[in-house]
Swiss-Prot record:
InterPro entries: PyrdxlP-dep_Trfase (IPR015424), PyrdxlP-dep_Trfase_major (IPR015421), PyrdxlP-dep_Trfase_small (IPR015422), Ser_HO-MeTrfase (IPR001085), Ser_HO-MeTrfase-like (IPR049943), Ser_HO-MeTrfase_PLP_BS (IPR019798), SHMT-like_dom (IPR039429). Belongs to the SHMT family. This is Serine hydroxymethyltransferase. The lineage of its organism: Bacteria, Bacillati, Bacillota, Bacilli, Lactobacillales. It is found in: Cytoplasm. It holds the Pfam family SHMT. It is an enzyme of class 2 (transferase). Homodimer. The modification N6-(pyridoxal phosphate)lysine is found at K225. Pathway: One-carbon metabolism; tetrahydrofolate interconversion; Amino-acid biosynthesis; glycine biosynthesis; glycine from L-serine: step 1/1. GO terms for biological process: glycine biosynthetic process from serine; tetrahydrofolate interconversion. The record marks H224 as: Plays an important role in substrate specificity.
């Protein structure tokens, strides 16, 4: 059914964004490229349907096919992560986290999460976020020397503040996380353990990172990033009693009608993630990240935080280049390499300026980049950050970026 002509301004902006994605090396760790099937599902007629409630328990009629779609997403998710419970309705990772807090906590309860400058997320207790306003939040950090999780410090803080909930997981941490150590600390202080695996869910699904599902009380994730699905959230658990609380906290607690067209996209993505080639993809994501980290680590003026990576991302300290993270992000944008500024451990600069960059490989790997391409990309970043005012350098890097994007088009 047609109601009106397309907005020329809108579709011009969409075409320009499509062109930008095609011609840019995308290194933002939280971004990826979905399949045509995921886009088709998300753009389907399901966007027309309201479906408050859960499969078999809706407040609206006409949901028989919607129920099938959402149940497929639930079943695929449970199989993918070997979990007994899955809620696929959260509109985002933040709302997934909010639902957990609403289900398990009361306003003013104590939560303990990773500090922002250590690699944590806003929703892990940052003072500017609901999680740091509605709850009494404390933070843990990294070992100053290793720049890895300091479990002695985490235990010490937990014993002091007696949290009701400990949040494990990160948005900018490049090492394997020992979930059992968090579990032991949570048990010692009588806290729930929630794991936010938004960044590493694809690695967990393919056994490239230990799974938190058997260890944590509750696990949240986004469905994009390394899962290569539509933008959205999900909650998983092996505790069915907690699952019941989660369902009620999400709906009717904090959300109304679920976005069933997005849930269809999630179902398609989870189906793709269950195929053997997805494991091959994730393995290549990690190989590409390690290859980039090695190149950065060999440079004279760029340092990889913690000395390397075990997953899909790394944080690079660019202090010795004389540039701020904001400067570097803008400079790289100019040569068609997209990154994001990132605080480094103990960063003295504000989160709007920073002393580092976060680099991730999910999107370039989806385009077909291999280790050689990843090393080349890292070398180009070093070249431009080391010589930012040289027009010849800028033009050379632009040319090389164009060749790489032409070699590996977005398909």
């Amino acid at each position: 059914m047609k109601y009106a002509e397309k907005s020329p301004a809108l579709w011009d902006a969409i075409r320009q964004e499509e062109k930008r994605q095609q011609n840019t090396i995308e290194l933002i760790a939280s971004e990826n490229i979905v399949s045509d099937a995921v886009r088709e599902a998300q753009g389907s007629v399901l966007t027309n349907k309201y479906a408050e409630g859960y499969p078999g328990r809706r407040y609206y009629g006409g949901c028989q096919y919607i129920d099938q779609v959402e149940q497929l997403a639930i079943d695929y998710a449970k199989k993918l992560f070997n979990a007994k419970f899955a809620n696929v309705q959260p509109h985002s990772g933040s709302q997934a986290n909010m639902a957990v807090y609403q289900a398990l906590l009361k306003p003013g309860d104590v939560i303990l999460g990773m500090g922002m400058d250590a690699g944590g997320h806003l929703t892990h207790g940052a003072k500017v976020n609901f999680s740091g306003k509605e709850y009494k939040s404390y933070e843990y950090g990294l070992n100053v020397e290793t720049e890895e999780l300091d479990f002695d410090q985490i235990r010490k803080v937990a014993l002091e503040v007696k949290p009701k909930l400990i949040v494990a997981g990160a948005s900018a941490y490049s090492r394997i996380i020992d979930w059992q150590k968090f579990r032991d600390i949570a048990d010692e202080v009588g806290a729930y353990l929630m794991v936010d695996m938004a960044h590493i869910a694809g690695l967990v699904a393919t056994d490239q990172h230990p799974s938190p599902i058997p260890v944590a009380d509750i696990v949240t994730t986004t469905t994009h990033k390394t899962l290569r699905g539509p933008r959205g959230g999900m909650i998983l658990s092996n505790n069915l009693e907690i699952g019941k609380k989660i369902n009620s906290a999400l709906f009717p607690g904090i959300q109304g009608g679920p976005l069933e067209h997005v849930i269809a996209g999630k179902a398609q993505a989870f189906y793709e993630d269950l195929q053997p080639q997805f494991t091959d993809y994730i393995k290549q994501v990690v190989k590409n990240a390690k290859a980039m980290a090695e190149v950065f680590d060999e440079s004279e003026n760029i340092r990889v935080v913690s000395g390397g990576t075990d997953n899909h991302l790394m944080i690079i300290d660019i202090t010795d280049t004389g540039l701020t993270g904001k400067d570097a992000q803008n400079l790289l944008d100019f040569v068609n390499i997209t990154t994001n500024k990132e605080s480094i451990p103990g960063d003295k600069r504000s989160p709007f300026i920073t002393s580092g960059l976060r680099i991730g490989t999910p999107a370039i790997t989806s385009r077909g980049f291999n280790e050689e391409d990843a090393r080349k990309t890292a070398s180009l970043i070093i070249e431009i950050l080391s010589d930012p005012d040289n027009e010849a350098t800028i033009e050379h890097v632009k040319k090389e970026v164009h060749e790489l994007t032409k070699k590996h088009p977005v398909e």
